[in-house]
């Protein structure tokens, strides 16, 4: 998914938190920053004024304005022009400093958003850097039901009619929590972290065939829903094999693997759907098994080691 943010959106999202006010350049409120640009050019998303390697949001504190004031008039104007030509998403003056008239005029002329804030520079830098990094992070929507099971994020996937929603309903009745049904959105907020959330349209809702759309919060209470969760495991429901295969299902280690999501390989466990199988119990067991494996405990490997040792002892 391509992600972007406009100057107007950033202003509205951070206006209350940072006390932002427009000073000039309001005609540039539709100026846009796309995630693709941050990858190809690799600028800093937010930082103190830098005319050589410009940040996408330039912060001007007292030192930056003092530096501008120390320049000769011609050099000062050339520097301001260069700043505007770098096409920043916005300029922000800290501590509600008085905006220099030449800077205001250049912002209006070039359509560069210029804001004032009562916050100190480091506060602006921390908030804006985090917010922009989060907003522009790579994201993808996956089909399935995303739940919190035993405190870890588990995505239940499978073909239509495989019983994902019914399984989710059973897990809810067993005390686990729903994050999103049908279309959870995952954002890579760190090199090894996928954060899953629910689209606003689908919040608190679970669709079950024969019952329609259920409001999980109303049926099971506030504790049955979760705003977000990191994705740690995918449980895939599949139809049983109708024809024998050379290997069949792996009896010792189970059908385990990984699924590539954005830049991460997420652990995957496949569960065959068959009459009489308690999928809720199996999913809970799969989650517990994953937790054990993350701690370095692998029951299958332990059994194989025991078996090998036994054979070695009995071999003359």
UniProtKB/Swiss-Prot annotation:
Enzyme Commission number(s) of this protein: 2.7.11.-, 2.7.4.-
Keywords annotated in UniProt: ATP-binding, Kinase, Magnesium, Metal-binding, Multifunctional enzyme, Nucleotide-binding, Serine/threonine-protein kinase, Transferase
Region (Important for the catalytic mechanism of dephosphorylation): 272-277
GO BP: regulation of carbohydrate metabolic process
GO MF assignments: ATP binding; magnesium ion binding; phosphorelay sensor kinase activity; protein serine/threonine kinase activity; protein serine/threonine/tyrosine kinase activity
Named cofactor requirement(s): Mg(2+)
Annotated binding of ATP, by residue: 158-165
Highest taxon of source: Bacteria
Residues covered by region (Important for the catalytic mechanism of both phosphorylation and dephosphorylation): 206-215
Chemical reaction(s) catalysed: [HPr protein]-L-serine + ATP = [HPr protein]-O-phospho-L-serine + ADP + H(+); [HPr protein]-O-phospho-L-serine + phosphate + H(+) = [HPr protein]-L-serine + diphosphate
Record Pfam families: Hpr_kinase_C, Hpr_kinase_N
Binding-site residues for Mg(2+), renumbered to this chain: 165, 207
Residues annotated as catalytic: 143, 164, 182, 251
Function recorded in the entry: Catalyzes the ATP- as well as the pyrophosphate-dependent phosphorylation of a specific serine residue in HPr, a phosphocarrier protein of the phosphoenolpyruvate-dependent sugar phosphotransferase system (PTS). HprK/P also catalyzes the pyrophosphate-producing, inorganic phosphate-dependent dephosphorylation (phosphorolysis) of seryl-phosphorylated HPr (P-Ser-HPr).
Any further remark recorded for this protein: Both phosphorylation and phosphorolysis are carried out by the same active site and suggest a common mechanism for both reactions.
Subunit organization: Homohexamer.
Name of the featured protein: HPr kinase/phosphorylase
Organism: Stenotrophomonas maltophilia (strain K279a)
This protein's encoding gene: hprK
């Amino acid at each position: 998914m391509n992600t972007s943010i406009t100057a107007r959106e950033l202003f509205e999202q951070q206006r209350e938190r940072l006390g932002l006010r427009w000073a000039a350049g309001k005609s540039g409120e539709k100026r846009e920053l796309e995630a693709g640009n941050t990858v190809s050019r690799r600028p800093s998303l937010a930082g103190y004024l830098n005319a050589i390697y410009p940040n996408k949001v330039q912060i001007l504190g007292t030192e930056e304005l003092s530096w501008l004031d120390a320049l000769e008039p011609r050099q000062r104007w050339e520097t301001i022009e260069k700043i505007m030509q770098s096409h920043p998403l916005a300029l922000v003056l800290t501590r509600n400093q008085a905006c220099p008239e030449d800077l205001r005029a250049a912002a209006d002329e070039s359509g560069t958003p210029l804001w004032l804030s009562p916050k100190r520079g480091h506060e602006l830098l921390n908030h804006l850097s985090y917010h922009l990094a989060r907003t522009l992070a790579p994201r993808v929507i996956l089909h399935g039901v995303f739940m919190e099971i035993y405190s870890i994020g588990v995505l239940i996937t499978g073909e239509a009619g495989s019983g994902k929603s019914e399984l989710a309903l059973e897990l809810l009745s067993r005390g686990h929590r729903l994050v999103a049904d049908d279309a959870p959105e995952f954002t890579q907020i760190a090199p090894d972290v996928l954060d899953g959330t629910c689209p606003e349209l689908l919040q608190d809702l679970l669709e079950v065939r024969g019952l329609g759309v259920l409001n999980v919060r109303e049926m099971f209470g506030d504790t049955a829903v979760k705003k977000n969760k990191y994705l740690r495991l995918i449980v895939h429901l599949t139809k049983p094999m109708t024809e024998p295969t050379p290997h069949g299902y792996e009896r010792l280690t189970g059908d385990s693997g990984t699924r590539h999501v954005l830049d991460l390989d997420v652990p995957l466990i496949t569960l065959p759907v068959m009459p009489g199988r308690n999928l809720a119990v199996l999913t809970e067991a799969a989650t517990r098994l994953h937790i054990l494996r993350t701690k370095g405990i692998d029951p299958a490997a332990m059994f194989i080691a025991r078996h090998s040792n036994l054979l070695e002892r009995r071999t003359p």
